[in-house]
């Protein structure tokens, strides 16, 4: 079991953070979709990391998507982070800021 995190790299807090996560693809020749999970955080302080959810290693064979929406400086922002099938692998590790752990990161 691994954990997924959201990093607020901005110099100010972000608000009304909504994260939708899902996995999809093929496993053993069958099309697979995970349940869509939704997470809400009223506020995430600047230069902070928060744990979103655990992710099972068996799901690394799927494409894993995190769709993040938040309010910042009076505007709404929306971005999709996609870990394509097989990208969550030690070969793609980097040091994750603020927690000083190794993992896969998309900016």
What residues fall within each predicted segment?
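A generic structural motif
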Residues: 7, 22, 69-71
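Short beta-strand elements of extracellular/lumenal beta-sandwich folds
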Residues: 1-8
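Intrinsically disordered, low-complexity Pro/Gly/Ser/Thr-rich segments with frequent PxxP/GP/PP motifs
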Residues: 27-61
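Terminal connector regions
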Residues: 53-107
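Short acidic, flexible loop segments centered on an aromatic residue
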Residues: 11-28
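A short, structured loop/turn motif at beta-sheet edges
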Residues: 9-14, 44-45, 72-76
């Amino acid at each position: 079991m691994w954990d997924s995190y959201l990093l607020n790299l901005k110099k100010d807090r972000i608000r009304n953070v909504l994260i939708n996560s899902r996995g999809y693809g093929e496993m053993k020749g069958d099309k697979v979709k995970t349940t869509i999970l939704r997470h809400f955080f009223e506020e995430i302080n600047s230069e902070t990391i928060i744990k979103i959810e655990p992710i099972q290693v068996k799901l690394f064979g799927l494409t894993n998507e995190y769709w993040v929406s938040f309010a910042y400086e009076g505007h709404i922002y929306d971005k999709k982070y996609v870990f394509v099938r097989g990208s969550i692998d030690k070969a793609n590790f980097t040091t994750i800021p603020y927690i000083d752990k190794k993992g896969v990161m998309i900016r």
